[in-house]
């Protein structure tokens, strides 16, 4: 993991390779490298730790050029981030880049070492280059070499390969990890991400599981796992990728936080009528499908999972539909019981999250009524696998820590909950639509808390632990607040249902522990106040975000952050904003890498 790009052309492709990698940088990575065929028809390789700009400098120094090459940005899974573990991995006449995990790499490595192979890295990926070289000694036919290699590999992979006996070809293969082939005039491209292809060509083929292809500048040969040729019509992307800038903001995360109001305004314009949701916003004939749903099953990871937990509260409150939410990495390995007329909903910003993709494939083999995806990237793997799709149109989210995608998911899920409620309460739809339409004005007021968050962040700078508490739909917002703080400031943070405080977390509370309570003015206010009183009794530092008017004693050290009044259903979208700002400014004070925090990747394409 994390990004693959390749090009074969009648012209020099070195700059194309660097440009392709630069468009994959947003996914997160710790090293980069490329291989190409030189004029002598031999494979030449350069690698570096750090950023693509360092690889670009290295390419200029070495004057590397060629018409056929592959490139990779790596996010470490097997082996520490260093030069020897960077891709491409070369052995014999082969050069390989790999996304995914070779699950039986240790076993394969032992077998190959016994055959006198010497390994130069700690990665699972290098095994592929050795297997290819091993089978090339036994088979003259390239397809036989490839098929025997693929049979030995257990796990997920997207592979791009150069072979010195075929110096005008890129070899690609896929199983459980996305890989696309872009088709152009006198050139063909490969990428793990449509965003790196969209400025090169609009025509592409998506490599399916257990397929491989041989690509030169003028042709693409596609094969199945048996080595039989297959034919598939190309797809066409409508994406026009523009260079994304910070527009004067210090970080992409800051920019993306402040874009949320405009995104919601677009939803109001494009998805809502005067009093009702526009027809079929979840795909053609989706309104008919939703009328038959009796259960909803959400599957997602990370921030998207937190969004699904909010949706569970909404759906069960506004309809008679039972709802469950599961972490994708757990769902894909367990035995499931699917009630009749259950809607499976997958949520992913990138549309390429490995565990979520595998969960959809599992769902497609189960007894679900339909599969719906909520995603930000058109033509992603998740949208292609789904029966219905809701595209968030939030624009590229570059920062690893998700902000605008989270609120876009919440809006989509609130619209889903409302659509499911139509049969039980016709007036409720109008009420929720009215609340959504107040959001732009309320968020304008919420962003005025930025200075408060700057002050509060200084108080958090030297803390080691933080608790976030909430009840009802505010509980998942507490989870999301904790996730944001730990992601970018590296402060240990936990989100809890406030009622669970005395069942364990209270043992952690002392005078150095900030405890943040999220308390919209609703029927749970008194319960949250009771929980926070327990914190104050242990000298904990209490911060309450609320729109309820509260009177405090002069000696009370509780910090009240006044929130703008808002409707019940939109409260999660309002209360998450100061949590994002708080995390951002704590990270500013700690001088961390905000847009690309350590050890994290934007698009998690391995399990």
Model segments located where?
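Conserved short alpha-helical segments that host acidic/polar catalytic motifs at enzyme active sites
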Residues: 1-246, 250, 262-269, 273-294, ...
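Generic C-terminus detector
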Residues: 227, 541, 554-556, 566-607
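Acidic/histidine-rich
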Residues: 153-187, 461-487, 522, 529
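Glycine-rich oxoanion-binding loops at beta->alpha junctions
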Residues: 67-84, 274-287, 311-347, 353, ...
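Active-site phosphate/pyrophosphate-binding segments
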Residues: 260-264, 268-297, 388-514, 590-607
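Glycine-rich phosphate-binding loops that contact phosphosugars or nucleotide phosphates
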Residues: 291-438, 471, 518-564, 582, ...
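Structural motif
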Residues: 68, 94, 295-297, 343, ...
